[in-house]
């Protein structure tokens, strides 16, 4: 089921009407009037989309960046790469499922792919911790980036996170140190690196994987810095 934002209500109504006209049970009975109506509604939808999305304010752009239906890292990995081999664990503490990482082929070239993954439904979002990486996630990516650097393999990273996970356990396991080490690792790599912000690029949680040679950004994606002092104090 498609999800709509509050400012997309007119588009939603038009698409519901269009779906009714395109109902397969009605196809045999479609008249020239119906087909003309379908074309007209589709044109109205296109016009509404253009009007709405060319005049978004800052909060609306943030909502679009966080949209439930926005393609996630998993989607791009499955559709852009071949022979993806996922790798897990940081060899210190455990696995962090909020980040996908592994080696793959891109245009017949071996690459390391890393993607912050929010999940596609409630269960997977909980499993992926809503894309908020823990220290073991950053240490996993550091391990793999160093491995790619050793074998001269380029690195492609997909950024989509509201920020690093601010929980007590993450802080106890060295969240700040893990982020700093990840930034340091990215800056020291000798292989080409490209980071693509596909949704949210929140704070140090994003910068830890976005310190690349090239940083690209999707339309209506967001990248921001925030002060987390009060958030940290509230945990202790």
Tell where the protein language model's regions lie, with residue ranges.
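Conserved small/polar residues in nucleotide/adenosyl-binding loops
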Residues: 225-232, 236
């Amino acid at each position: 089921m498609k999800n709509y934002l509050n400012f997309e209500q007119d588009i939603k109504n038009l698409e519901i009407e269009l779906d009714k006209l395109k109902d397969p049970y009605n196809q045999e009975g479609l008249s020239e009037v119906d087909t003309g109506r379908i074309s007209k509604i589709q044109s109205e939808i296109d016009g509404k989309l253009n009007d709405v999305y060319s005049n978004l304010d800052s909060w609306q752009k943030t909502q679009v960046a966080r949209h439930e239906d926005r393609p996630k890292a998993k989607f791009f990995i499955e559709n852009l790469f071949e022979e993806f081999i996922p790798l897990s664990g940081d060899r210190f503490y455990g696995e962090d499922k909020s980040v996908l990482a592994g080696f793959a082929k891109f245009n017949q070239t071996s690459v390391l792919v890393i993607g912050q993954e929010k999940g596609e439904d409630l269960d997977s979002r909980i499993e992926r911790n809503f894309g908020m990486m823990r220290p073991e996630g950053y240490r996993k990516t550091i391990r793999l980036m160093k491995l790619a650097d050793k074998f001269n393999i380029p690195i492609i990273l997909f950024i989509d996170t509201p920020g690093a996970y601010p929980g007590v356990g993450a802080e106890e396991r060295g969240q700040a140190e893990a982020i700093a080490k990840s930034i340091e690792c990215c800056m020291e790599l000798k292989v080409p690196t490209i980071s693509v912000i596909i949704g949210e690029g929140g704070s140090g949680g994003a910068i830890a994987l976005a310190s690349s040679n090239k940083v690209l950004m999707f339309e209506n994606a967001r990248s921001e810095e925030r002060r987390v002092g009060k958030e940290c104090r509230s945990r202790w």
